Regions:
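Conserved acidic donor-binding segment of nucleotide-sugar-dependent glycosyltransferases
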Residues: 305-306, 310-317, 326-332
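Glycosyltransferase donor-sugar binding loop
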Residues: 40-41, 213-227
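Conserved donor-binding/catalytic core segment of Leloir-type glycosyltransferases
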Residues: 6-8, 147, 177-215
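A short, well-ordered alpha-helix in the C-terminal region of glycosyltransferases
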Residues: 326, 333-348
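Nucleotide-activated donor-binding/catalytic signature segment of Leloir-type glycosyltransferases, i.e.
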Residues: 218, 226-253, 258
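Donor nucleotide-sugar binding/catalytic pocket of nucleotide-sugar-dependent glycosyltransferases
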Residues: 51, 133-177
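Short hydrophobic beta-strand element within catalytic cores of glycosyltransferases
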Residues: 259-261, 283-286, 290-293
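Membrane-proximal helix-turn-helix segments that form the acceptor-binding/catalytic region
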Residues: 23-25, 67-75, 94-97, 104, ...
C-alpha cells in the first residue's frame, strides 16, 4: 500500500494551480493523495481526492473554525500532511503531536509582507511582523520539512529548519501556438491579480504613449482600486475579461503581442531582488510572448539572460511604453524573443525540473515508505 498524503489549504481554491495541478497531481502518481480545501464539493481530480471543508471567507471568523480543518484532516489519517497557509501553523502542531509528519509550504515572506499590509494600522505593522516571526519560528522548527518558492525565503527558512528546500512555481510545459505579423489591433496582456501591486495604473498611463490596447483578466482584489482604474480616461482601451478558467488563458495569450508582469518592489519579494514564485512571466515565455517585466535582479537573469524580453522600472510608464513600442515595431526581434522564452521554459523553467525535488523530499520525510522504494527514481535525491 502506498503512503497516504494530505494537502491542506483554508484560503486557496481547490483548483489552485500550484497546489492541485502541480504538487498534488505529481504526488498522486506515487501516493494515495488527498486535498482538503474550503467550500467545495468532494470530487476526484487525476487521482487526487478533493475534500471540502466549510469555512468562512472572513479572516477572523475563519480562525474560530480551524477545528473543522483539524477534525477533517485527522479523519483522512494520512502519513504526511502538507500545509499551505500561515493560519494553519497551529493546526500543523496539533497534527504533529499525533505522530504524523508535517510539511509547511511557504508561498510568501509573511513577516515582510505584514510590513506593507494596507488593512493594518501603520503603527501596528512592525510589532505584528515581529510577533508573527516568533510564532513562525516556534511552529516551523517543529515540522519535518519546509518548502518555499524563491531563494530569499529559502535562506530565511533554513535558519529556522535546516530541512528546507525550494520548489519553484514554474509551469507544466506545453507548447502554445503563437504568431506575429497578424495585422490589426496590437495588444499587451496580463492575466492574474487585478491588484495595485501589479501596477495596472502604470500600464494604463503607458497606453498614452503606445498604440497597443490592454487585454486584462483576473480577480479583482480591492474594489476601490478597480474603480480607480475604471475612472481613467484610458479604460476605454482596456478589454477586461473577468476571471478566466485556466484552459482559456492560453487563448488570451494567442491574441496578445506582449506579456506584462510589472510587480512592484516590496519587502515580500526582497525589494529589488525579486522572486521566482510568480508564475505569470514563465507562462508568457511558454506561450512564445515577449515579456516586459520588472527589473528585479532575479528576473533580469531570466529575461535578459535568455533575451526573451525587456526589464523596466515598474513605476515608469514612459519606460514601459518604450519597451512595448520597441517590441511592437520590430516583429523579427519579437519573434526571436518569443522563441527564446519558449525554449528557456522547455529546457529549464518548467515543473519537470521541480517535481523530483518535491518527490525526493517526500521520500526522505516519509523514511522511504513508497510501495516500491528500491525502484524509486528519486532515491538519489535524499
Amino acid at each position: 500500500m502506498p503512503a497516504r498524503v494530505c494537502h491542506i489549504t483554508s484560503v486557496h481554491p481547490a483548483n489552485d494551480v500550484r497546489i492541485l495541478y502541480k504538487e498534488c497531481h505529481s504526488l498522486a502518481q506515487h501516493y494515495d493523495t488527498y486535498l482538503l480545501a474550503p467550500n467545495v464539493n468532494d470530487s476526484l481530480s487525476e487521482g487526487v481526492h478533493i475534500v471540502g471543508v466549510p469555512l468562512s471567507t472572513h479572516r477572523l471568523q475563519r480562525q474560530l473554525q480551524l477545528g473543522r480543518v483539524l477534525r477533517k484532516a485527522l479523519e483522512v489519517d494520512a502519513d504526511i500532511y502538507h500545509l499551505h497557509d500561515p493560519e494553519l501553523m497551529s493546526v500543523g502542531l496539533r497534527i504533529r503531536r499525533q505522530g504524523k509528519r508535517v510539511i509547511f509550504d511557504s508561498h510568501e515572506d509573511v513577516p515582510m509582507q505584514l510590513l506593507t499590509k494596507e488593512y493594518l494600522p501603520r503603527w501596528s505593522r512592525k510589532p505584528l511582523s515581529s510577533l508573527y516571526a516568533q510564532w513562525e519560528r516556534h511552529c516551523l522548527s517543529r515540522y519535518d520539512a519546509l518548502i518555499t518558492v524563491t531563494p530569499s525565503i529559502l535562506e530565511r527558512l533554513r535558519r529556522i529548519n535546516p530541512n528546507s528546500v525550494m520548489v519553484t512555481n514554474y509551469p507544466r510545459f506545453q507548447a502554445l501556438p503563437h504568431s506575429y505579423g497578424r495585422g490589426g489591433q496590437q495588444y499587451v496582456c496580463f492575466a492574474g491579480e487585478v491588484a495595485e501591486r501589479y501596477m495596472h495604473h502604470v500600464v494604463l498611463e503607458s497606453l498614452r504613449l503606445t498604440t497597443a490596447n490592454y487585454l486584462l483578466a483576473g480577480r479583482v482584489f480591492v474594489d476601490a482600486y478597480f474603480q480607480q482604474l475604471q475612472r481613467s480616461d484610458l479604460w476605454q482601451r482596456v478589454e477586461y475579461l473577468g476571471v478566466l478558467p485556466p484552459h482559456e488563458v492560453g487563448s488570451l495569450y494567442q491574441r496578445a503581442d506582449v506579456g506584462l508582469v510589472l510587480l512592484d518592489y516590496s519587502p515580500n519579494v526582497g525589494y529589488h531582488k525579486g522572486t521566482l514564485g510568480v508564475l505569470k512571466m514563465f507562462e508568457y515565455m511558454m506561450a512564445g510572448l515577449p515579456v516586459v517585466a520588472t527589473d528585479f535582479e532575479l528576473w533580469k537573469e531570466v529575461v535578459e539572460g535568455h533575451q526573451c524580453g525587456i526589464c523596466v522600472n515598474p513605476h515608469d510608464p514612459q519606460a514601459v511604453a518604450a519597451a512595448v513600442n520597441h517590441i511592437l515595431s520590430h516583429p523579427d526581434i519579437a519573434q526571436q524573443m518569443g522563441n527564446n522564452g519558449r525554449k528557456a521554459v522547455e529546457t529549464l523553467y518548467n515543473w519537470a525540473t521541480q517535481e523530483p525535488v518535491l518527490l525526493g523530499l517526500y521520500e526522505q520525510v516519509l523514511g522511504n515508505l513508497l510501495s516500491t522504494p528500491d525502484n524509486s527514481p528519486y532515491s538519489t535525491l535524499n
